[in-house]
């Protein structure tokens, strides 16, 4: 299990403006909004990753990132560089585009050099503005056991409420057969017609699968370059 964690790169998407939290986000990105005193929203993703044994973490920043960068420097200084552990903040590098990130997938694509340099077995994509507790080792172990190209972390909610989320359809062996972003008529889980599986925005990919999907998506002018809308449905 430790080897799986060591060969996984975590990329936390932290570029959201958080317009619905204004004025809290007037001077900072949503992931750096304070939570319970000295903590920030980003600390949930950070704690989940650390408690899952993950020690290679890249925060993909863009919008008003100074507050977040300071929090990383002052509060996350726990890594040992000599053992290959790190947490770093990366903004648009200008290697593949001079523009700001155009979507969640584009944010990772513009930093594809980081993935290629690290050369992990898996890449775990997280959102830096989600509040939840999870052990990602279960996700890694499941992917290893199934030899899965991609795994999405999900939860069940009443089907009547699912139209606000990305909804996943699976077969009896829980292989993904459908994915729809905010569908008007959400499909139900096969084991219970009253609930639907929704995406939590946590994606685990085999690195070659992710790189191919990002390169293919980047060539599509009409794409919104979003994991939920474009990358996952294309797999």
Question: Each PLM stretch: what is its role?
Answer:
Residues 1-235:
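Unchanged
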């Amino acid at each position: 299990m430790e080897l799986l964690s060591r060969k996984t790169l975590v990329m936390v998407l932290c570029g959201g403006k958080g317009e619905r939290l204004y004025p809290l986000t007037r001077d900072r990105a949503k992931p750096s909004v304070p939570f319970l005193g000295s903590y920030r929203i980003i600390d949930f993703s950070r704690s989940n990753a650390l408690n899952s044994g993950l020690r290679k973490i890249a925060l993909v920043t863009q919008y008003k990132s100074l507050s977040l960068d300071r929090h990383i420097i002052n509060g996350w200084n726990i890594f040992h560089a000599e053992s290959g552990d790190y947490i770093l903040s990366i903004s648009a590098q200008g290697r593949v585009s001079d523009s700001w990130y155009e979507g969640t997938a584009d944010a990772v694509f513009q930093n594809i050099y980081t993935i290629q340099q690290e050369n992990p077995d898996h890449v775990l994509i997280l959102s830096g503005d989600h509040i939840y507790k999870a052990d990602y080792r279960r996700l890694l172990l499941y992917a290893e056991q199934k030899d899965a190209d991609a795994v999405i972390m999900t939860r069940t909610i009443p089907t009547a409420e699912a139209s606000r989320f990305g909804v996943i359809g699976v077969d009896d062996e829980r292989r993904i057969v459908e994915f729809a972003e905010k569908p008007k008529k959400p499909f139900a889980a096969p084991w219970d017609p009253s609930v639907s599986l929704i995406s939590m925005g946590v994606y685990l990919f085999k690195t070659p699968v992710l790189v191919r999907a990002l390169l293919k998506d980047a060539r599509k002018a009409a794409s919104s370059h979003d994991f939920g809308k474009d990358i996952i449905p294309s797999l």
